[in-house]
């Protein structure tokens, strides 16, 4: 699919730059691997259930209302990422720099690599650049203007944002005890090193071209190509895959909203509300698909019909009866009262 889009978008490769071929090949492989892993991820019973229910709830309610709510979720989860700000202001700024720097870099790089965007100078004035998108001229600007500065330095801006995010992330990982205890090199440190290599080598191209008179440009260009290719190949298999999983989390927000507004499930033991009926029913179905049987013989048909506090109480009571035989904790001389929700455990043999 990506290959077809490259051919069509570049007008049968007419505007495709062969010097960017390694980037294009790595992008094609990365897209195929991401699509395969995403399809496998969606086949997991819990993920599949959330996915199906999320789309059903989106189309089931008012389309306009749900579209507005989806737009608000996109703004909160992707543009501002306020859910991270509630945890830590440092992590919020760090994620904003990394996410916006990465999105800006991909928004500029991929259309250029695929040949969807190309530049040309006017025939009558070589100081004026024309911007073509899918072969259609959309803008032109003269060299030395603000538009030229912003266009030609977009990747530099993204690299600076990424470097700031990396610095904040390293500061957190070197100073917070929790991060130090849980971090792993392959999952937490390696992605930062790869991002640093891409951003630093990209800025190195600008430094070489503008201030070093092209000295070392070929070596830096090869290094940058190698680091970008490695990053693209790493996308489907490492921590960066959560970037593609994140949009699916928006369906969970629809699910939670419907669960709060819908009928609630009542505990079979204390008869208190503890979750939505939809969530309990979905959980039962997922457990069946995972080959877990939590059905009970008694007044309560299924273990998931019991609220978490009662589950803890039942566990303690039945363990006490099993270990001590009499009383709740072996101190009460009265015979134990069987709980109607769970079968009595077999007494230990003497």
Go through each PLM region and give its residues.
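Short recognition patches in nucleic-acid-associated and regulatory proteins
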Residues: 273-301
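Short functional micro-motifs and their immediate structural scaffolds
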Residues: 272-279, 312-319
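Short metal-coordination and nucleic-acid-contact micro-motifs, chiefly zinc-binding Cys/His arrays
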Residues: 262-266, 300-303
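Short cysteine/histidine-rich metal-coordination sites, predominantly Zn2+-binding motifs
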Residues: 251, 282-293, 322-330
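Short cysteine-rich clusters marking metal-coordination/redox-active sites
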Residues: 267-271, 307-310
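Short polybasic linear motifs
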Residues: 329, 334-336, 341, 346-348
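Membrane-embedded alpha-helical bundles of multi-pass integral membrane proteins
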Residues: 1-265, 314
